[in-house]
Swiss-Prot record:
Protein name: Pre-mRNA-splicing regulator WTAP
Location within or outside the cell: Nucleus speckle; Nucleus, Nucleoplasm
Main location: nucleus
InterPro entries linked to this entry: WTAP
Known function: Associated component of the WMM complex, a complex that mediates N6-methyladenosine (m6A) methylation of RNAs, a modification that plays a role in the efficiency of mRNA splicing and RNA processing.
Species of the source: Danio rerio
Gene name of the encoded protein: wtap
PANTHER family associated with the record: PRE-MRNA-SPLICING REGULATOR WTAP, WILMS' TUMOR 1-ASSOCIATING PROTEIN
Subunit record text: Component of the WMM complex, a N6-methyltransferase complex composed of a catalytic subcomplex, named MAC, and of an associated subcomplex, named MACOM. Component of the MACOM subcomplex.
Annotated Pfam families: Wtap
Bias-annotated ranges (Low complexity): 405-423
Recorded phenotype for the gene knockout or disruption: Multiple developmental defects at 24 hpf (hours post fertilization) including smaller head and eyes, smaller brain ventricle, and curved notochord.
Amino acid sequence: MTNEEPLPKKVRLSESDMKTLTREELCTRWKQHETYVQMLEAKYADLNSNDVTGLKESEEKLKQQQQESARRENILVMRLATKEQEMQECTTQIQYLKQVQQPSAAQLRSSMVDPAINLFFLKMKAELEQTKDKLEQAQNELSAWKFTPDSQTGKKLMAKCRMLIQENQELGRQLSQGRIAQLEAELALQKKYSEELKSSQDELNDFIIQLDEEVEGMQSTILVLQQQLRETRQQLSQMNQTQGTSSGAGPSRTSPSTASEPSTQSEPANASSSNVGKDCGRVSNGPSNGNSSQRGASGSSLYREASSADEDYPPSPSVSSPTHDGISKLSNHSEDAVSQRGGEGYVTQLSAGYESVDSPTGSETSVTQHSNDTDSNADSHEAAAVPKGSRTAGTRHSTQNGLDSSAAAVATNTSNASAGSVL
């Protein structure tokens, strides 16, 4: 069937038409009816071909929805059953509680008869009456303090409250400002005090550094003096040995020479002691910066020690005795004692010179003790004082020159004494 052909129409035949129409007309009507039926069948086929897939999908969706709805229905039924069961349990519990709470006549009678319960109820009644009285009093006070915005008393009270609040704020500001000023003043004082403490601490540190430098210089000078003293002692011991050997080799020939021997021995001893005292005074005045009175006192004390040494060991007056070797040994011993005492006076003079150092911290005794202790352990201080000697090069040079001169004077005196003893 094409689009140009008209659409067939439904053929309708009544009973009268079936009787009146001829066979040919009936055939034509039948053919029209067949075309109409074919057209309907074609339309139905077209509709079936287009909508079968959609109908299947919709059918599957409907089946899934039906299954979900059935599952939900089952879940809801189960929940409903559980809720009904819980409701039944709650109703049973409520009934049980009602039965329990409804006391029987015997329970009521026993509770009324019990004196403890009666006392408890009486106390509860008294407390209830007290609370009611307090509540009424509080309500009366509240109603008395209530006022409307238009009332004059309320306005006055509000103005008074505002004024009091302002005064309180002003007083708080004044107090805070006064406290802040006081704290600022205290802070300034503390800062000033801390600055003063810092300055004093710096001064003390400088003073301590200066004292350390002075002590190091003194230690270096003490070390140098100890070395010089050791060298002089070695020289004296060597000279004494040479003198002893020379005195033993040359015997006395004439008595006048032996008679003049004590005077010649005493004079060089006195001269050597005086020279040593002068040199020691010069050395002690070098590092200790002593005055002239200290120098005189040190020289006189050293001279006294030398003279006392001469008096302790006087020479024998016998000139031509056969024990001339013993006399010469005794004179040598006296010279050794004089030299030893001169060395001791030298050490005491050095300690006295170091005691005259001005130290405000009261460390004079420690310095002298250190100078006395360093005589025994000079070897241990040599390695420590050698790098520090560069700080006191001038002082060391001056003291070394003085000690060199003193050592030369002692050597000349001892050589003169040995020559006199030989003569």
